[in-house]
Amino acid sequence: MARILVTGGTGYIGSHTVVELMQKGYDVVIVDNLSNSNVDMLDGVTSIVGQRPPFEQVDCNDAVAMQQVFEKYTDIEAVIHFAASKAVNESVEQPLKYYRNNLLSLITLLEQMQVYNVHHIVFSSSCTVYGQPSEEHLPVDETAPIQMALSPYGNTKQINEEILRDQAYSDANLHATILRYFNPVGAHPSAMIGELPNGVPQNLLPYVTQTAAGLRQQLKVYGNDYNTHDGSCIRDYIYVVDLAKAHVKAVERMLNGEADEQVEVFNLGTGRGLSVLELVNTFMAVNGVDVPYEIVGRREGDIEQVWAKPDKANQKLGWVADTPIEEVLKSAWQWEKKLRSL
């Protein structure tokens, strides 16, 4: 089977994707500098698939180190690029860090791919490129207008998409698949891998699970005066395992020569919007635990409501995110309990 280079492969989505690739029989090599992930994730991956994936502790911005990776693994046929700094709030405080890490890593990768004749890349993008879509663009499909980014993080995703398009235009051999994720949640059903925030969680569900586990006194719900049915923000929460499977489908589509265009874009979501309060209440109901929460003021930069229209991915990738949210929320709690030995 083909070898797939996975940058950021010890991270949350990366580790789940490595599992799906290996279970499909692909050879992988993980590149990660461990700046916002933990090498222990490799133990979890090994427990699930029965084999330890090759791992290189390398910064994707380091051209010499990346060159050595391509020299060592001469059978790489595709790259899945997850490695990035990803905290929206931090990006506002440290924009240069985000522009350096997120732009330079992709540029370095594309340069090495060109040298070593690797022609397929899957890029980890985000629904943040759509900003707050107007009502006529809900649910959001791939033709929705790209809005001005609300953070340097979001801006790096937009710029990287343009870099990929420009590079593909200049290199007829390059094929890129841009995957715009909605809100990844949950953990592998084995509870061997899951979301492991370094420091303060950036996403809602780790806050919920940590509050349920007693690590936090109460959850803050930012705003209950939005123009939604219960006043809280609405998001499209997609199970991380379903999301990981979409990456395998995207790689296969390119390697099989099935792509319609040199650069393809897919929205990855469930097609269903769920409010913050619905998520919290469903979590409590399915897990039989209490999550104390308080309503506080809106958080700057939060989008009111966004959810995907995933028809294109359903049809062209032959993929669907259909794991019930109840199962997803149970998986998140199993992972948290394992982490805390509860």
State the predicted function of each range:
Residues 2-78, 200:
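N-terminal Rossmann/SDR dinucleotide-binding element
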Residues 62, 105-108, 120, 159-160, ...:
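Conserved cofactor-binding/catalytic machinery of classical short-chain dehydrogenase/reductase
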Residues 77-80, 122:
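N-terminal Rossmann-like NAD(P) cofactor-binding module of classical short-chain dehydrogenase/reductase
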Residues 93, 100, 104-111, 129-183, ...:
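Catalytic helix-loop patch of NAD(P)-dependent Rossmann-fold dehydrogenases
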